[in-house]
Amino acid sequence: MRPAAAALLLAACAHGPSAKALKTAEIHHDLALEALQKGAPQDALREYDLALEADPSMAEAHMGRGLVMEYGLGRLPDAEAEYRRAIQLRPSYSSAHNNLGQLLARTGRPEEAIKEFDEALASAFYREPWVARCNKGQALYAMGRREDGLAELHRCLSIAPRYCGGRRELGLILLNEGKLKDALEELGTYARDCDKVVDAHLQLAQARMKAGDVAGARASFERCLELAKGAPSGDACRKGLELLQ
């Protein structure tokens, strides 16, 4: 190959995917999201793979693959690799840092996790900083840094008072510490602000049982069952009601 022709070929490769390829990748990415919403992880994985065939540098597709690996297939090492690949492609990708952080935390690496949460929070463009703050708070608490952990959780909720995950985790921590009054307040807010979430009413019901509030527990278990509509998520609520008979 002549030097001039080789230079032209290299220049063409350096430009990356064409506009058509980028559009194709975007379409497959959107189809993957639809598959995830329908509870079809294998279909989602196939669409993410097609997105990456069209655009190998699509960080969102790698993060999506990570979510499928972690939550759909339980393949945690593969999920970690995908999150890291997404970050490699886009170092300021806050959502990928947060997802990697929560995976590191759940696999017993809280110190590494906190670094990832801090990376997520370093970006002014992160759309959901309260999520990383809540996750960081839980990691700090798990490390034995109780005050720091609770401070992060409160900071999370000061930013997003209606964040269901934050209310849940703070409420459960307080419950486990034996602070029933404070726990009931947090879990009550969780159930009120996240009324359509089955778990919110389950957690409140169980806390009310611990507090000896039988009538309140029964009402929460009944609301939980009403929302579950026969799904497996309502089994714990059904068992709770049976205990109150």
Task: Give short role names for the model-derived ranges.
Residues 38-47, 72-85, 107-119, 143-155, ...:
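Structural signature of tandem alpha-helical TPR/SEL1-like repeats
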Residues 30, 64, 99, 135, ...:
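Canonical tetratricopeptide repeat
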Residues 36, 63, 70-71, 98, ...:
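Position-specific recognition of the canonical hydrophobic site in helix A of tetratricopeptide repeat
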Residues 33, 67-68, 102, 138, ...:
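Residue-level recognition of tetratricopeptide repeat
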